[in-house]
Amino acid sequence: KSFDNIYAYGLMNEPHDLDSCTTWFEMAQLCIDSIRTVDMDTRIMVGGNHWSSAERWVELSDTLKYLKDPADKLAFEAHVYFDADASGTYKRGYDEDSCYLEKGIDRVRPFVEWLKANKFEGMVGEYGIPDSDSRWNLVLDKFLSYLQENDINGCYWAAGPWWPKDEFMAITPVDGKDR
């Protein structure tokens, strides 16, 4: 509360395997209520149900639009990966994952449209691509352009010197060379 460099309180990263979205809704509301007893100034970031899936946001996290924040400073966080099951494991290649240039846009659009329809702020808290095929970069470029066009911020998943050199999604240069 006393630090001016805190952007938001993140309630939980990738809630999943809960009984229902209502359960996550109830937990999130309790957290919001508790935080607001001590801090009315800092934004609260709420991740979506089922791994914060942007693609399935309306299906699995729509009830979050009914959360109440007396400070009116809620924001929402979704995650997006471009592989076949949207897990970010990229177990198969670009072709085997049936990837195409607008796949990232198609995956994030439900979340972006939900934010707009409900007049909420939000961000993509995780996205990333493997370094195994340069075509993933083209998908990422289109995705990032779409986020920029819609004033949505995002965070790449694997960056920083603590990632192993062989981490397939890391973007940190290795031995002075960009990936």
Give a label for each model feature.
Residues 3-8, 12-152, 170-178:
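Extracellular glycoside hydrolase catalytic/binding regions
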Residues 48-50, 157-164:
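Short, solvent-exposed turn/loop segments enriched in Gly/Ser/Thr/Pro and often Arg
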Residues 133, 164-165:
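Short secondary-structure boundary/hinge segments and terminal tails
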